[in-house]
Amino acid sequence: MNSVLTAASYILVHAPDMVVHNGTTQTTERVVNPGSEYLKQLPEHIRSYDQAVAYAPNQTYIGNMTPGQLGEMEQPWHDMPVAGATREGRYGEIMPQDEFLLLMQASDMFDLVRLDRAFVAKTKPALEKHPLLGQEILALVKAGEDASDIARAVNEEHAEGLYHMGQLVGYVKRAHDVDANLSAHVLLENLASKASAVLALRHLLHTSGVAPEEIEYVIECSEEACGDMNQRGGGNMAKAAAEVAGLGNATGSDVRGFCAAPSHAFVMAASLVKAGTFKKVAVTAGGSTAKLGMNAKDHVRKGLPVLEDVLGGFAVLITADDGKNPEIDLDIVGRHTVGTGASPQAVITSLVLSPLERAGMKIQDIDKFAAELQNPDITKPAGAGDVPQANFKMIGALAVKTGELDRGGLNGFIEQHGMVGWAPTQGHIPSGAPYMGFARQAILDGEMEKAMIIGKGSLFLGRLTNQFDGISFVLRKNRGAAQQQQEPGISKEEVRGMIAEALRSFAASMEG
Amino acid sequence: MSLLNRKIIIIGDRDGIPGPAIEECLKGTEAEILFSSTECFV
């Protein structure tokens, strides 16, 4: 019996000041070229919260639009605000930066996040209206400090500033004098990732209707590392986030694998549930402050707004087969092995063609492929092209190569079996995961039967290997009821007959 | 095109043509690969 996808949640955090102060493109520029034109022009290209909310890919991410609806809109999307766009979506929300800074403090167990007294007084009433955070989380927000103490900590004590609307409103304190792993910079990244995972988990409780104490295990699959100098990647951000989210009966662990980590985590979670080890497993990831404004130089140069101004997060709940929700079919798992090689053809063969052939299926038996779902509005002006389209084109090309598709049908294949991308370029966030919620709904609504989720990861960025990586699996309509009917079982009558036969045989042997 | 005495720097793209694939294409030519890496822009 396979495990099933019960619920998904998707959140964004608008983080315009973090783009300027924490995105590595900007922090690097301040080191190598502090007086650059780019840094001078950058603030003029930062979007307001309302602009970020009205951005069609963001509305898609939180579930207010479907990928299909987004695909019908002409590109580029950045100058086509969605009328009636809202903060809340079917799967989550777009949280403003000021509220998020308070959530970061609530997610900090070591008194490292300090906020300005007036800023807290102004922002806390808004957070108190949040329907999903609860009193336990709000109680962790402290009254705040004087502005002069905050400035001193940033200027004299190696603290990392927290900004809102260009103003210094707080800081993250370093947790060790010399250990770079506990520097204010690293802690800010980790706490932002943790807090956005907490928000995603709280939304998952809402979208699933599952009580917090029912979740037994959490797998966190971001790209951050937490630990100290003796165990730099010691980890368990999963349990750290579960604690704040109120999942009192959960333990957990982290899965790492660059952008492929979520897909690895989904397969592991599905396996844990299928094996009966746990009944309810959540997979979650928060966002990356480092990647904010990653391609902003190109966006600014071309007169565009800085489109990488949101942190992403998601959470997915995988549970035992309920006969209704879509199955995660572990009989169709593709994997990029050490011996696969790096060419695009080899990669897609290992992730798509090979697992389908092993299952006796063709490429076109899959209704939708969800590979790298990066928003092309972000990547095209930066010269990285349309990443999802490139992936779907390669899948279609393989279908042509195997003879199941005519060459002339390639564009139609991409349209029918692919989708436009809508996810922010937050590394692990776009890699298949954003489609899980939509796929579940489309399968439940009878619009399709099978989706393949594909995660791909750039292991070479860590300079330990030149290997690429990836893993894929199929989400499919629940076959529970049909399968049980087809599988030959033993009826009560048959059991009775077998016992009677055994007793007769036993009695006969006694007589003998 | 002759690649004799040519020095090559390869910057591959994770979602395009990765470095090792370009290296593979240059095997059998006389080009000298000075540096090869694959970068990720997303």
Where are the language model's segments positioned?
Chain A
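Conserved catalytic cysteine-centered active-site region
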Residues: Q167-A180, A184-L188, G227-M268, L272-K279, ...
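Condensing-enzyme catalytic core mediating Claisen C-C bond formation in acyl metabolism
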Residues: M1-L191, D298-I363, Q416, G455, ...
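Structural signature of cysteine-dependent C-C bond-forming condensing enzymes
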Residues: T207-E216, G246-T251, A275-A285, R358-Q364, ...
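Short, well-ordered amphipathic alpha-helical segments that serve as non-catalytic structural scaffolds
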Residues: S193-G209, A238, P344-G360, I395, ...
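Flexible, glycine-rich active-site loops centered on histidine and acidic residues
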Residues: A275-V310
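Acidic, glycine-rich active-site loops and adjacent beta-strand->loop/helix elements
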Residues: C221-C226, G257-P262, A285-K291, G455-F460
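Conserved beta-ketoacyl condensing-enzyme motif
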Residues: S193-G252, R256-G257, K362-K393
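Short acidic, glycine/serine/threonine-rich loops at helix termini
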Residues: M229-R232, H264-V267, L292-D298, K380-G383, ...
